[in-house]
C-alpha cells in the first residue's frame, strides 16, 4: 500500500494517463541496462547489448520495457493493493528468475528520471515526490516474496 494524499494520487494518475508505455518503458528498461550493466545478465536472450546504442535500439528491450510498464499500469490502477497486484510477479522474479530485489528499486528510480525527461516542467518536484512513493511501493510489493 502506498500512502498518498488525495492531491498526490490525482497528480500521479493524471500524469500516468499521458504516458506512452511503449516509449517510456523501452527507454526506462534500456537505461537500467546501460546505467547498471550487471542487470543485463537477466536478459541473455535479448541479443546485442554490447553498447549503449545497441541496448537502446534493441527491439526485445523495447518490447519487454512495454511489458514492464503495462504491469506498472496495473499497479497504478490498484495503488491501495500493490502487494496483491504484484504477488504473482514477485513469486516469478523470486522463485524462477532469481532477480535481486534491489533491481526493482533501481528500475523505479530510472523510471522517475525518464518521466522527468518526457514531461519536463509538468513533472514538478511535488509530482516527483509522489512518484517516488509509488515506485518505492511497487519495489516493496515486488520484493514481498523474498521476505
UniProtKB/Swiss-Prot annotation:
Residues that bear N6-acetyllysine: 60, 83, 145
Tell me which residues bear Phosphothreonine. Answer: 13
What InterPro entries does this protein's entry cite?
Globin, Globin-like_sf, Globin/Proto, Hemoglobin_b, Hemoglobin_oxygen_transport
Q: Which GO terms describe its cellular component?
A: blood microparticle; haptoglobin-hemoglobin complex; hemoglobin complex
Could you state a single Gene Ontology molecular function term? hemoglobin alpha binding
Can the keyword Iron be found in this entry's annotation?
yes
Query: What CDD domains does this protein's entry cite?
Result: Hb-beta-like
What is the role of the protein in this entry? Involved in oxygen transport from the lung to the various peripheral tissues.
Protein name, per record: Hemoglobin subunit beta
Q: Which organism is it from?
A: Carlito syrichta (Philippine tarsier)
Q: In the UniProt record, what gene is named as encoding this protein? A: HBB
Amino acid at each position: 500500500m502506498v500512502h498518498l494524499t488525495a492531491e498526490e494520487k490525482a497528480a500521479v494518475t493524471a500524469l500516468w494517463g499521458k504516458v506512452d508505455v511503449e516509449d517510456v518503458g523501452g527507454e526506462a528498461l534500456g537505461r537500467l541496462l546501460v546505467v547498471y550493466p550487471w542487470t543485463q545478465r537477466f536478459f541473455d536472450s535479448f541479443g546485442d547489448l554490447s553498447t549503449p546504442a545497441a541496448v537502446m535500439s534493441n527491439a526485445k528491450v523495447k518490447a519487454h520495457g512495454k511489458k514492464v510498464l503495462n504491469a506498472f499500469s496495473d499497479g497504478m490502477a490498484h495503488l491501495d493493493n500493490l502487494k496483491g497486484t504484484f504477488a504473482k510477479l514477485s513469486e516469478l522474479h523470486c522463485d524462477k528468475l532469481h532477480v535481486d530485489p534491489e533491481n526493482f528499486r533501481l528500475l523505479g528510480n530510472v523510471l522517475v528520471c525518464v518521466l522527468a525527461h518526457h514531461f519536463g516542467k509538468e513533472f514538478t518536484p511535488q509530482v516527483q515526490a509522489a512518484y517516488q512513493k509509488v515506485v518505492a511501493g511497487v519495489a516493496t510489493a515486488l520484493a514481498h516474496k523474498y521476505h
